[in-house]
Structure formats: C-alpha cells, structure tokens
Amino acid sequence: MVKVGINGFGRIGRNFLRAALGNPALQIVAINDLTDSKTLAHLLKHDSLLGKLPAPVEAADGALQVDGQRIVVFSERDPANIPWREAGVDVVIEATGFFTEREKAAVHVTHCGAKRVIISAPGKNDDLTVVMGVNHDRYDPAQHVVVSNGSCTTNGLAPAAQVLHQQFGIEHGLMNTTHAYTNSQALHDQPEKDLRGARAAALSIVPYSSGAAKALGKVIPSLDGKLTGYSLRVPVPVVSIVDLTVTLSRNVTAEEVNDAFRSAAASGPLKGILGYSDEPLVSSDYQGDPRSSIIDGLSTLVIGGNMVKILAWYDNEWGFSNRLVDLAVLMDKKGL
C-alpha cells in the first residue's frame, strides 16, 4: 500500500481524496494546506458539485478523521518545511498549482523525505508526463522522480488522439476545449494581466490559451508539433468537451472512426479510461464520470475523405482525480 500526502487541499486535492477512499492500494496519511482543519473538513464533507461525502468526517487539532482514518494536517507555506518523513509519506500529490517546476516540486523528496512527487498540472522540466492508458508504461523508477499527470484537458485529448493516430495516422490538427470555469477565474470583473480572464466567469464565453495540444507531444512524441488549439471557458461549473479536428493519412468514414473508438474503449489499455457513447447526452450527464475521455459518437464528422472532427466529453475534476489515484498506485507497483 502506497502512503500519500496531499500538498494543497483545493478542488483537485479534495477530489483526489474522495477518489482514493476505499482503495486498498492507497492510503492518504497527511495533508498540507494553509487553511484550518475545521474548514478543510467542512469543504470535504459538503461539496457543491459532488454532494455530501458518504463517510464520516471530523476535524481534530492538527488532523482530519475521515471514515475512521486519521489524516495529519500540516500548515506549512514553504514545501521544504513539510514533515512528510514523519508521516511516512511515500508519494506527494502536488496540488497547489504553484510548484509545477521540477526544482520546486522536487523539494518534497530532497528536503522532506518523500520518495516521489506527482504534479497535478502540466509540469515544467518534469521527469515524465504521464497520461494513463496512453504512455503509463514509460514510467521507470530508476529515472522518474517528479512526474506530471498533465492537465485534465491533456487527459481528455490524448486517448482520443492516440486512437486516431494509431489506426489512421494524424497529419495535423486543431483542438478546442469548451471548458468549465475554474477557480482561477472570478465571479465579477477584476483586474488581471489577461484582459479576457479579467471578466466575470459566469457571464461570458471567455477565450483562453490552452497548452493541452502542445503537451500532447510529451505524451505521444510522434504527434509533437502536429496539433495546436485553445480553450473557451463557459458558464458551467464542471464537465468540459474536447473538439478535435484532424487531417488523417488516409480516407475514412465516420463509422470506421467510431468503430475504432468503440474497440479501444472496450478492451486494452484504454478500457475504463476512454469511453464511447451513441446516446444524445449533454454535459451534466457526464458529471461524476471517472473516465478521462468519452467519445460522443453522434458528433463524429468526416469531410473530404480524410478530415475528421470528433467530440470527447470529460469531467475535468473527477476524471482527472481518478487518474491521479491510478498513477500513484502504478508508481508504487513499479517501484518508488
């Protein structure tokens, strides 16, 4: 069983804990967050998107009691001071969003006694970026100490792109993610460096940059430089959708494309990670879906023989958090 510490108990930190509950291969033993234990307990127990946690949660002095298990809570601003070693932490989930550079994230290992770090965001100079089901087999404990789980959008894009590339070959393409608003945005207009990002999140469709297509090259090297794209933040709290348009190496039909997705979703390394649906569903139907990417088969289009457009739904919090759990367990099995 791998013992995990969470640095940053925000949306992803709390989703990760919920996803990990009851998993016999993983135990959360410590949390570091600047917020007091009472507030952390309340936000874990009562979630506006996930509902009430179906397990008892209590706050104690310097700890949380979750489903009968004690989780020690630290409150260190500097990661170098977090006593992970004392808590017996093997793997740290770096979920603050602030320490995404390798040098900063590695402090959990070099100064604090953890064995590995998983960054819950795109990393900078990280040892390896992993998208489960796509390139998880590349993890090598002899080489990889600071590992990134990529972004929720990279996890939504990569499985679909891999299937298309393996089956038909991708020449180049464009991606847009119609993305739920996040905590980086504000309820009302306020000064920001990004003047579009300065606007009220719930009142507009807000164009944003997205590094998901560029990051895809770190996960599928043969697609490096072949995709680019952006994001449109929209007034929904969760669930996003990747719109991917690619030029393939050969002519195809929509049915061929959908058959490839059905097959990949049913068996092999993408089973349970990639999904496929022919139902006429909307974003709210995918809230709480643990898969990384669900192909909307009704929306697959082909024009000119080899230009293809597909849509892939993803719960940008819950699906991503489940992959964090999977990655921590995988790293423990392969060696820390």
Located regions from the model:
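Short clusters of hydrophobic/aromatic residues that line enzyme substrate/ligand-binding pockets
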Residues: 64, 130-132, 146, 187-188, ...
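Conserved active-site and cofactor/substrate-binding residues in soluble primary-metabolism enzymes
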Residues: 7, 11, 35-38, 87, ...
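Acidic, glycine-rich segments within the central catalytic cores of soluble metabolic enzymes
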Residues: 166-237
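C-terminal active-site/capping subdomain that shapes the small-molecule cofactor and substrate pocket
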Residues: 229, 241, 245-336
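Small-molecule pocket liners
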Residues: 128, 203, 242
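A broad structural signal for alpha-helix termini and local helix breaks/kinks
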Residues: 96, 112, 168, 220-221, ...
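Generic structural signal for residues in well-ordered beta-strands
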Residues: 71-73, 227, 310
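N-terminal Rossmann-like NAD(P) cofactor-binding subdomain of oxidoreductases
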Residues: 1-198, 302, 326, 334-335
